[in-house]
């Protein structure tokens, strides 16, 4: 089992540790609800070093990635990042990822922890058609720290005073130094709040983590585990691989059409997406439940005539709204905000309501 460079800090902080994606990771510290609320009201510090990361370099690196992903990388300038998906030829999702453009020949990819080996193999399988392009896995060399919340930018400013964070917009990044260590700081995140994600060599991770934590103490900063990371993303309706998206779900079903650019030229899965677009019958929607039960993945969803129309993708008790919420993959004609549905939780049907996503408003608006 792998450990991140911050593992011993988590252990000393009393975190509950679990196996996630082959890493020993903190699932919670003080508790999921308290950590969630800290991010929504102040700031949270996340160790997400288990995420996979690759460098793609070479003269034809952009052409290679344009073929591998759904979004249009030609629209991305140096110092910008873009949300993307890799698809199988049938339109199912290999993974979702963020691509950072350092320059025209250098791209940095962050992928889901559970898919790192699969993604590397998928990219490597197709790279041969693009002469001179090189793929390198740096997952074991680099740490990734996320600082998220309404006061996150105020905190990071004190640790990196030379960086003009006011000029750094969402999905932009800069490169600087922390001591002698090269650092990449991106205005990205998985919570819906203002914040940054910071990538740096493993040996510099602990000093930076402690500096950010100390700088945020007066603001109410909290370390945050994977448990609250999931409730935060679910309140925003963000997709998680293996839940809202997977190898059998087309991104058009999953509310991700905005990240699929049919007119950019050829990419793997394009023809399948075009066919799905013509005959789109299902979609992912948000829902809430009236009773205090927790809807879980694979619970069946029914219409008011008690006909099965789909299944739950993700579910939780929203710490912000204090009610059970979730996402479901259902027949499209039932995706109307305010419509009633029924969710089967442990053999009992519970009345719910289709909800507009995201469930909450945040510091990003």
From Swiss-Prot:
Signal sequence extent: none
UniProt key word Transferase: yes
Keywords of the record: Aminotransferase, Transferase
Documented EC number(s): 2.1.2.10
Record field: catalytic activity: N(6)-[(R)-S(8)-aminomethyldihydrolipoyl]-L-lysyl-[protein] + (6S)-5,6,7,8-tetrahydrofolate = N(6)-[(R)-dihydrolipoyl]-L-lysyl-[protein] + (6R)-5,10-methylene-5,6,7,8-tetrahydrofolate + NH4(+)
GO biological process: glycine decarboxylation via glycine cleavage system
InterPro entries linked: GCS_T, GCS_T_bac, GCST_C, GCV_T_N, GcvT/YgfZ/DmdA, GcvT/YgfZ_C, TrmE/GcvT_dom1
One annotated GO molecular function: aminomethyltransferase activity
Gene Ontology cellular-component terms listed: cytosol; glycine cleavage complex
Pfam families per UniProt: GCV_T, GCV_T_C
Protein's UniProt keywords contain Transferase: yes
Disulfide cross-links: none
Entries under PANTHER family matching the protein: AMINOMETHYLTRANSFERASE, AMINOMETHYLTRANSFERASE, MITOCHONDRIAL
Family designation: Belongs to the GcvT family.
Its biological purpose: The glycine cleavage system catalyzes the degradation of glycine.
Subunit structure: The glycine cleavage system is composed of four proteins: P, T, L and H.
Protein name, per record: Aminomethyltransferase
Annotated organism of origin: Chlorobium phaeobacteroides (strain DSM 266 / SMG 266 / 2430)
Gene giving rise to this polypeptide: gcvT
């Amino acid at each position: 089992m792998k450990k991140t460079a911050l593992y011993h800090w988590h252990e000393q902080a009393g975190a509950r540790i679990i196996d996630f994606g082959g890493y020993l990771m903190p699932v919670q510290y003080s508790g999921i609800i308290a950590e969630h609320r800290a991010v929504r009201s102040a700031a949270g510090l996340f160790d997400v070093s288990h995420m996979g990361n690759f460098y793609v370099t070479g003269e034809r690196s952009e052409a290679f990635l344009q073929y591998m992903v759904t979004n249009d990388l030609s629209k991305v300038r140096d110092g910008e990042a873009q949300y993307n998906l890799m698809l199988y030829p049938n339109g199912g999702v290999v993974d979702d990822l963020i691509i950072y453009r350092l320059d025209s020949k250098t791209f940095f990819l962050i992928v889901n922890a559970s898919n790192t080996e699969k993604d590397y193999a998928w990219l490597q399988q197709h790279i041969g058609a693009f002469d001179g392009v090189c793929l390198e896995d740096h997952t074991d060399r680099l740490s990734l720290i996320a600082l998220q919340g309404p006061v996150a930018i105020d905190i990071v400013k004190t640790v990196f005073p030379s960086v003009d964070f006011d000029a750094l917009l969402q999905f932009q990044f800069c490169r600087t130094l922390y001591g002698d260590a090269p650092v990449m700081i991106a205005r990205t995140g998985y919570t819906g709040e203002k914040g940054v994600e910071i990538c740096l060599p493993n040996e510099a991770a602990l000093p930076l983590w402690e500096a950010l934590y100390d700088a945020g103490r007066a603001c109410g900063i909290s370390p945050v585990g994977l448990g609250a990371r999931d409730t935060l993303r679910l309140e925003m309706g963000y997709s998680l691989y293996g839940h809202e998206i997977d190898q059998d779900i087309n991104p058009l079903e999953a509310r991700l059409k905005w990240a699929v650019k049919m007119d950019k030229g050829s990419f793997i899965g394009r023809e399948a997406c075009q066919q799905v677009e013509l005959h789109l019958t299902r979609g992912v929607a948000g829902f809430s439940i009236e009773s205090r039960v927790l809807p879980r993945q694979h619970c069946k969803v029914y219409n008011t005539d008690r006909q099965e129309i789909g299944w739950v993708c993700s579910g939780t008790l929203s710490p912000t709204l204090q009610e059970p919420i979730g996402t479901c993959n259902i027949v499209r004609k039932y995706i109307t905000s305010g419509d009633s549905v029924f969710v089967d939780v442990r053999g009992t049907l519970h009345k719910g309501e289709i909800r507009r996503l995201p469930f909450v408003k945040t510091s990003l608006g």
